Amino acid sequence: MAPLGASPRLVLLFSGKRKSGKDFVTERLKSRLGGNICALLRLSGPLKEEYAREHGLDFQRLLDASTYKETYRRDMICWGEQKRQADPGFFCRKIVEGVSQPIWLVSDTRRTSDIQWFQEAYGAVIQTVRVVASEQSRQQRGWVFTPGVDDAESECGLDNFGNFDWVIENHGDEQCLEDQLEHLLGFIQAKL
């Protein structure tokens, strides 16, 4: 059930592998749409905040792309999975509390349970977006395969999801990416 007061016109659920460019794409869309129209939501935000609180860590440092975050990533994944097993909608509910903008971009959807929660809560306004990048492109962005991370559900949970409503190819061709974003922006603006 959707939290009270939350009635978005469109919720885009973004997913993709580490270093595929999910944050880059969603930040770009938000900058074009504006903060009064578009909310950028991260499921990892409340997860990292709660994990930092329970483990006495620096929450702000867990938010950046630092080695600090990478040091705790594997344990944080296991901890988050335990929370989700107890309550699959725990982190989903947290990120939508108090959001008033009509367009929501969820930048880090990682599991079918995340998608199911949003579909049950918001129905027809949900669109799934997969950001894909070649392994070579991801490596150029600093990705290195990490056992226990890149083969965990947090990275592979949507590999066999089926058909996404949108697929954004982010292999490093700026014009190709721009064309895809323009198409998606047209769809979003039609919902306003």
Swiss-Prot record:
UniProt keyword NAD, yes or no: no
Pfam families the UniProt entry points to: P-mevalo_kinase (PF04275)
Gene3D superfamilies attached to this UniProt entry: P-loop containing nucleotide triphosphate hydrolases (3.40.50.300)
GO cellular component, one term: cytosol
UniProt cross-references to InterPro entries, sorted A to Z: P-loop_NTPase (IPR027417), Pmev_kin_anim (IPR005919)
Source organism superkingdom: Eukaryota
Recorded catalytic activity of this chain's protein: (R)-5-phosphomevalonate + ATP = (R)-5-diphosphomevalonate + ADP
GO terms assigned for molecular function: ATP binding; phosphomevalonate kinase activity
Main EC class the enzyme belongs to: transferase
Record keywords, A-Z: ATP-binding, Cholesterol biosynthesis, Cholesterol metabolism, Cytoplasm, Kinase, Lipid biosynthesis, Lipid metabolism, Nucleotide-binding, Steroid biosynthesis, Steroid metabolism, Sterol biosynthesis, Sterol metabolism, Transferase
UniProt keyword Transferase present: yes
Gene Ontology biological process terms from the UniProt entry: cholesterol biosynthetic process; isopentenyl diphosphate biosynthetic process, mevalonate pathway; response to cholesterol
Residues involved in substrate binding: N170
EC code: 2.7.4.2
PANTHER family in alphabetical order: PHOSPHOMEVALONATE KINASE (PTHR13101:SF1)
Assembly mode: Monomer.
Protein name: Phosphomevalonate kinase
Record lineage: Eukaryota, Metazoa, Chordata, Craniata, Vertebrata
Protein's gene: Pmvk
